[in-house]
Amino acid sequence: MSLYIGLMSGTSMDGIDAALLELPSNQLIHGITKQYSDDVRRNLDNLIMGNHLTLASICQLNTLIGREFAEAVRQLLIEIKVHPKEIQAIGSHGQTVCHDTSGSIPYTLQLGCGHTISSLTGITVVADFRTRDLVNGGQGAPFAPLYHQQIFSKVNESVAVVNIGGIANVTFIAKNQMTRGWDIGPGNCLMDAWIYKNKGALFDKSGVWASQGEVIHPLLEYLLQDPFFHLDSPKSIGKEYFSLSWLQKHLKPDYTPADIQATLLALTAHTIAETILNESGEIKQLYLCGGGAHNTHLKENLARLLPGIAVKSIVELGISPDYLEAMMFAWLAAQTINQIPVNLTSITGAKSIAILGAVYPIIKSY
């Protein structure tokens, strides 16, 4: 038995998920979510929205996020009463602030200094996972299908898993076939940004506000014309693309805020449903994970758009939808520490298998 910690802050930027994972059983021992401090959250919002931040402030933010990730580890270990020396390594995703693979020089950047996390926790850290995939010819995202493949390793039927974070991504798993996956488009990011702008709330709990509005069909049809939705896989996208500025250029003064929220939920539902339906009727089970798995109204919309397909939360398999990605980075850290390459060729389009991440070791005293 080996213990690893995974740290994840996704494109929703709603906090840091920390998961203690036992391997090789893939059992979640404990998980917590630590909210970002107000200063860090504000600076991240400004950075993602393209507001001016100095190079010095971005460098400071890298260290501050590292400190917050380390504090999440400290809180996790205190709650579960585990000593840092019992942990083999931490897998830290960091906080994505930009990700764009559309140009001749693809790039991705996750903040959260690995040296800071390692120094403050006394635990070896593996971080900067996505860059290795980019230089290997991949999209750098999504990685979730790798871990979904582990969970459904004994699958006897075709299933789809959709992770609804800030960006939604899909995994298709079938017996005796290569696992495939890619980014679909906006998951929660536009709904979160819109409700924050209008109501000051971080997210639309259960989709209640969206359920009070009416879908603006001309707006929905216009949004669905965005070129990203029509790209072939593999493909990936960042939250900075599907931003409020992307949305606001399509809005008209007579649109009500609640109706816009309803339309944004419909956009997420329609793009997910179309992705599933394009699998030619093979899929009979759709499992949802990520924060969007708690959105009752979104789940109802998906069930309506996908007749004949059972739409479920991954919690029905005894797996936490909130900590699945953090668990994945704990698992990825174990692969890196043990020099085990992973295969993203059918997911991100990588040219070959690769060992992901950079290792930030500690010096152990004996």
Curated annotation (Swiss-Prot):
ATP binds at G10, T11, S12, M13, D14, G15, I16, D17. It comes from the Bacteria. Catalyzes the specific phosphorylation of 1,6-anhydro-N-acetylmuramic acid (anhMurNAc) with the simultaneous cleavage of the 1,6-anhydro ring, generating MurNAc-6-P. Is required for the utilization of anhMurNAc either imported from the medium or derived from its own cell wall murein, and thus plays a role in cell wall recycling. Its EC number is 2.7.1.170. Pathway: Amino-sugar metabolism; 1,6-anhydro-N-acetylmuramate degradation; Cell wall biogenesis; peptidoglycan recycling. The keyword Nucleotide-binding applies. NCBIfam families: PRK09585.1-3. This is Anhydro-N-acetylmuramic acid kinase. Keywords: ATP-binding, Carbohydrate metabolism, Kinase, Nucleotide-binding, Transferase. It catalyses: 1,6-anhydro-N-acetyl-beta-muramate + ATP + H2O = N-acetyl-D-muramate 6-phosphate + ADP + H(+). It holds the Pfam family AnmK. CDD domains: ASKHA_NBD_ANMK. SUPFAM superfamilies: Actin-like ATPase domain. One of its GO terms (molecular function) is phosphotransferase activity, alcohol group as acceptor. PANTHER family: ANHYDRO-N-ACETYLMURAMIC ACID KINASE. One of its GO terms (biological process) is 1,6-anhydro-N-acetyl-beta-muramic acid catabolic process. The keyword Transferase applies. InterPro entries: Anhydro_N_Ac-Mur_kinase, ATPase_NBD. Belongs to the anhydro-N-acetylmuramic acid kinase family.
